[in-house]
From Swiss-Prot:
Protein name, entry field: Protocadherin alpha-C1
Organism: Pan troglodytes
Segments on the Extracellular side according to the record's topology features: 19-683
Signal sequence residues: 1-18
Repeat positions for PXXP: 812-815, 845-848, 886-889, 904-907
Source species taxonomy: Eukaryota, Metazoa, Chordata, Craniata, Vertebrata
Region (4 X 4 AA repeats of P-X-X-P) location: 812-907
Key words of the record: Calcium, Cell adhesion, Cell membrane, Glycoprotein, Membrane, Repeat, Signal, Transmembrane, Transmembrane helix
Positions bearing carbohydrate: 38, 248, 274, 562
Amino acid sequence: MVGWGVAVLCLWVSCGAAAGQLEYSVPEETERGVAVGNLSADLRLPAAAMSSRNFRFLSSHRELYFGVDLPSGNLVVREPADREQLCRAKAACVLTYDLVLEDPLELHKIRIHVLDTNDNSPLFPAGDVQLHIPEFLTPGARFALPNAQDDDEGSNGILSYSLSPSQHFRLDMGSRVDGSEYPELVLEKALDREQRATHLLVLTARDGGLPARSGDAQVTIIVVDTNDNAPVFERSVYRTKVPETAPNGTVLFRVQALDPDEGSNGEVQYSLSNSTQAELRHRFHVHPKSGEVQVAASLGPPETLLEAYIEARDEGVFGLASTAKLLVEVTDVNDHAPELDFLTLSNPVPEDAAPGTVIALFSVKDEDLDSNGRVICGMSSAGPFQLTASFDNYYSLLIDGPLDREQISEYQVLITASDSGSPPLSTRRTITVSVADVNDNTPSFPQPQQELFIAENNGPGASLGRVFAQDPDLGKNGLVSYELLDVISEGPSASSLVAVESSSGAITAKTSFDFEQLRGFHFQVEGRDGGIPPRSATVTINLFVVDRNDNYPVILFPLPRNCSVPVEIVPRSARTGHLVTKVVAEDADSGSNAWLSYHISRASDSSLFRISANIGELRTARLVLPTDAVKQRVVVVVRDHGDPPLSSSVTLGVLLSNSVPQLLPDFEDVWEPGGQLSAQNLYLVIALACISFLFLGCLLFFVCTKLHQSPGCCAQSCCRSTEDLRYGRKMVSNPCMTSATIDVTTVERLSQTYLYRASLGLGSDNNSLLLRGEYNAADLRNLATGVGLNLPISCIQIRNRKGDHANVNAMPRQPNPDWRYSASLRAGMHSSVHLEEAGILRAGPGGPDQQWPTVSSATPEPEAGEVSPPVGAGVNSNSWTFKYGPGNPKQSGPGELPDKFIIPGSPAIISIRQEPANSQIDKSDFITFGKKEETKKKKKKKKGNKTQEKKEKGNSTTDNSDQ
């Protein structure tokens, strides 16, 4: 609002003795602080006096719109006053206040008139107006419109109404009973909803203020529809083509009829008209809402024209309808694929069939017409085939090139027949052409030569390898059999050495190969197929024998002479590195199996000597000291590098002397300085003594039990048969002969075995000697007599390799009392070649292997080759035994005697062999030469030689552990 200025109109002032009344006027919405009038002047009272007289300004209104400014005495506006809020629906708006003054008391009434201003525009309380007028009304129809309201009074109120221009409506004013007016809408022209469904008008109300204010209301006139229009199709005739194979549900048309009416008057439903023939009504289906015409049944043969009528009707109260014509032309489609009919088919086809050979003959046909029935045939194949047209709709499949079953054994021929329709239809047929085999391929080996390797000492039947020839032919034409062909010009034939399995080609050995005798040979194997005629090929087999470590090193130098230890003399003044001797050895094996190294395994003084590991030179490792013993003993082991390694040893005696003695001393007792046993040997002697005493106790108990059960038996009736598992021979043993036995065995070098077993019965004059071997009767008789056995003739039996038995008369003979072990014999018994980590002993080169006995401290039960020495040999039989460890000794050649054995009264050496671990020969026997009386005599000498026997026991134990 615009401020009017401060205009105070004093209408009148009524002064009385006690009260007065003042009136003021102010326009509404006057701003704060504006002076309405000067109370001080109107009351004729100074402004300062008002304050001194306790001036008070009272009002009955909640809000104080006016107040008194004491310094100036003016009546001012505190809050703008809105007349429409303070005095709604009142012609005059007056605010009354009370002014109280004291001393003297005075009361004044103040009336303030709030004057109206044109600050409000006309307003339609209902807002926009919406009228529904049916289109069928005639002009002149009247429709009341709402009044507008204006809060202002007097000329600021509403004075007039106006309507926006329209060709269908005009505005008119109606009057009420109270004289008030209201606007009316009058229809000037008939309405058509299909042309214009909605009319928008603006009703405006204006007041009389300065400046004038106005308010608008939008009048929306909606024309209400009536069913005055029938549906109209887009086209009067619908024409289409449909294939004869159209399935049910195929949409032929989508017709549409338009109805400009609204609502249900304009909703159209479709159906077949009654004008359609009854026989066609079941072939079509019309959707009532969408107007789709679908196929409901078969339309009949091609080239048929079907005519039907469709009706569109609205849903008004009085439904209006219209019709359209449907023309459906049934057309032919390519709905038949070509058919193939095979008249002949040759399968399989031989791979040598000539080009031009007919494989198949077939015909094609198509039930469709015109281009849909024209058929074109084609072929797709990677093979040598050709498709040709014989005559109308007949085709032949021919061979167009060579066939090879080994490259391709089967062909897949794809024949395609296509018509000329749109789209074309085709039929495919795959023919499998198998190629029959003919024998046109020769067996072939992967290589013309093949190398095979076999380790020596193989067993007969060992697999050497396998040959394999490939033949791509089929069946018997590709079945290869193998045959051995001899091509060895010298030596044994290949057929005597190897065999070839005809079906698998496996090559096996017929014999055991020895690398040292046969290092390799070659032969041929022929592979032949089973075709007609057969084809064959050969392969050369080069067989190599691989060496095994089966030969022990053989010491060539130094060699024991006369069964004594070889002795070397070293001056005491020898310097360090003095050459004592050189050990020379050889090995029949090859490669690393023959690579020898030399080591000192034992020495009387290990610090005095050293040996070259490669060349075997034994040298002094330091200067000879005066305290060094004169007699030194060194055991040199020669070991190869096989897997496992084999070794041999030689015992050397070294005499530390500046002069050459006339008689060499005995080195048998030289092992430890000062003649003392090492702690290890001492433990071994104690263990052997305990075991020996335990064994003797068990043996005595067993003998007593046997004597108690069998007081006597004859030599022949008490014999029983046992089996020698190693050699497969039977021998006869007498259970009564448990007191003493001697077993002397030489293991075969190739296949010969010699076993001598003698048994002497306890407490009986009838003794038996059971020997096995290939000796004549005289030799066996001499042997039995020589060993001092008193045997009856009836108990001497001989069994040769053929299994024949014979009895030999044996004359008893006493042993030679002069036969003793000499010092050289004892020394020779300690010079041996042994297998590493075993107790098998061998002789020097060129001679058969031997197993030398060692001396133990007691006479335990013999185990695996332990035997007692002969009585009268110079050693008490109850104090030591010959003993050697287990092993696999080499075997003697056929016809060979045991290497060495002792005959009483002769310097020869007995070679005592170990029986195999699994041998069933009774191991509980031990050797006693002579009679019991001689044994008793020897026992008397035991006490006198007690000190010497202990020394021999210690040396024997030391030798045994070394061996």
